[in-house]
Amino acid sequence: MNVKFKMPKLSNLLKKSWASELLMTFLGTTISIVLTFGTATWVEHRQQMKNRRQTAMMVISNINVFGENMRYIDSTLVKWSSTLRYIAELPRDSVLNLSTDDANAFLSAMFGAMLLQRDKTAENIFTSDISTWRDVGNLRFISGVGECYSFINDIEKNYRIQLERKGELRQRFFEDYYNEQMTGGECVAALLDMKGTKYFINDFTGSFVYYFEESINNLLQMNRINMQLIGVTPEEVMNFIKAGEQPLQ
């Protein structure tokens, strides 16, 4: 039996070979582009997520540090409040006969000032570059941070008012009695007799110290909600703060 083989034309072989190579080249290029683009997108997404978390941690830590600074100041305010109230309620004869230590404690409470300071870098970033915060992608978190900073500004304003009132009383007292030779008890009595002193003491001991303490609790509670919104624990915040306090090597 004769078997006939039909030889393909050379032109057909060339066409098939060219088409095959072209197809393989196209597929290879497509796969390469897809893999490269997909990897780049994934890396970018991971970096964005990392940046968002770092930015959020910076703000949360900043608010927390302010709250803890308030707590430190509050311990002194409570002592001052107790001293002022106790001595202001004493009979005048007892005031005139105060010991040097008690008189000094009263004058320190009246004229002492602890500055409530903070680093405003995080707040400035928050308020000046809102696009940065849109990238965080959590509107409730953004709103919560804004409320915290608004609350902090109110606290600073009210605290500054107390310092200014103290400063006014201090200036008037020294203008009136700078050249007077008085005992500690006489100084305290003169200060209590001065217009505005007892009103300040009543306001400071009766409402401001309470307001300050409640503000600490409220601010830190608001910030705990911020932590929950982005899945951050208090331990992570403390570690972030400690890392920021380390000196550069």
Please state what every model-predicted region is.
Residues 43-61:
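Alpha-helical transmembrane signal-anchor/signal-peptide segments
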Residues 2-14, 60-249:
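Interfacial alpha-helical end/capping and short helix-turn segments at domain and membrane boundaries
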Residues 9-47:
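Membrane-embedded hydrophobic alpha-helical segments
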